[in-house]
Amino acid sequence: MLESVQQTTVEVFEATSNDESIIVSVDRQGASVGVQLEPEAMDLADEELAARIIRLNTLAYLRSQLALRLEMEGNHVENVGSFLPTEDQVAAFAMTIDF
């Protein structure tokens, strides 16, 4: 008997610190799916590390929501909500990642 194996591809959006010591991933819905910490990140104070993870998670989330906006616009969906970020808004937030 042959078993059918169904593969599902999960679209992942990442945000990475400038030194690549912290990498945060979210799925298409914006749910966190991973945090990777390199040894350099472990030298940070707990509060600073947490703040950086949150900011990178926010950037990854914004990227996932931008992808949704672009898909909706590509499918000519009318009235794409203002709750979905624009490319300029995501780029502006990305510029605040100074670590």
Which functions belong to the PLM regions below?
Residues 1-23, 34-99:
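Acidic, negatively charged sequence signal
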